[in-house]
């Protein structure tokens, strides 16, 4: 599946606004999908990532920890910095990416999906839900995992290749992806949203439909497909 025709920068701005608007007054709220993090760590993390990505879009790889208070304002500032940087340098500017030198447009897509997954993380324990994101956007997140993150994980030695080929099917839009070569031993089917969340470890097998060799599927899914 080729990269979707998504206008990433307006979508990024929308998702960042929703994230900022969802930051609770009580930052001690637990975020179960992020281990032992509270909202404090999640908000600071996404703000730090936005600031780092803005640097990467300019060809500078520098990571700095953010402040220890004023997290909502810090997030808003870092989100704005990222948007302004991406707009200023343009999509074709030479940048550093997660897979080597490439265009700054890499970060348009990457930060949309970074924000989307963490928006899910933030809103879920607050019982806010996450509606209004088109299936094609979630499907693009699946494509990013299959075509970029999984191969990168293997290249970096963070995981072994999947031992058996597995097919993923978005039941709402009919798109298919495959990890591994050859005829798939199993299929995982769900709406694109659930597939994306599943691949990022946000939901489990109870939220998808599987078919085929269950034992081989289970072994394949032990691989760490994302960071």
Locations of regions flagged by a protein language model:
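Hydrophobic protein-protein interaction segments
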Residues: 132-181, 187-188
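Hydrophobic/aromatic-rich structural module bridging two neighboring secondary-structure elements via a short loop
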Residues: 55-109
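C-terminal interaction segments
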Residues: 184-227
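Actinobacteria-biased recognition of intrinsically disordered, low-complexity terminal regions
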Residues: 1-13, 17-24, 221-227
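Short, contiguous alpha-helical
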Residues: 17, 24-61, 99-156, 195
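Hydrophobic packing residues in well-ordered alpha-helices of helical domains and bundles
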Residues: 5-12, 68-75, 108-115, 138
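Short, mixed-charge aromatic SLiMs
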Residues: 67-77, 134-152, 216-226
């Amino acid at each position: 599946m080729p990269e979707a025709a998504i206008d990433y920068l307006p979508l990024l701005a929308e998702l960042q606004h929703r994230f900022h608007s969802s930051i609770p007054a009580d930052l001690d709220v637990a975020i179960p999908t992020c281990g032992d993090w509270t909202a404090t760590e999640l908000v600071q993390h996404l703000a730090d990532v936005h600031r780092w990505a803005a640097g990467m879009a300019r060809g500078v790889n520098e990571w700095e920890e953010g402040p220890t208070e004023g997290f909502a304002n810090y997030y808003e500032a870092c989100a704005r910095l990222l948007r302004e940087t991406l707009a200023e340098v343009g999509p074709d500017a030479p940048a550093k990416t997660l897979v080597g030198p490439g265009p700054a447009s890499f970060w348009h897509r990457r930060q949309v999906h970074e924000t989307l997954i963490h928006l899910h993380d933030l809103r879920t324990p607050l019982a806010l839900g996450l509606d209004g994101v088109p299936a094609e956007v979630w499907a693009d997140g699946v494509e990013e995992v299959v075509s970029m993150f999984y191969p990168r994980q293997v290249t970096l030695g963070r995981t072994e290749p999947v031992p058996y080929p597995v097919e993923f099917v978005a039941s709402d839009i009919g798109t298919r992806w495959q990890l591994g070569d050859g005829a798939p031993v199993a299929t995982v089917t769900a709406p694109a949203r659930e597939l994306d969340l599943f691949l990022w470890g946000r939901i489990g097998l109870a939220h998808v439909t599987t078919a085929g060799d269950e034992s081989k599927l289970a072994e394949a899914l032990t691989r760490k497909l994302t960071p």
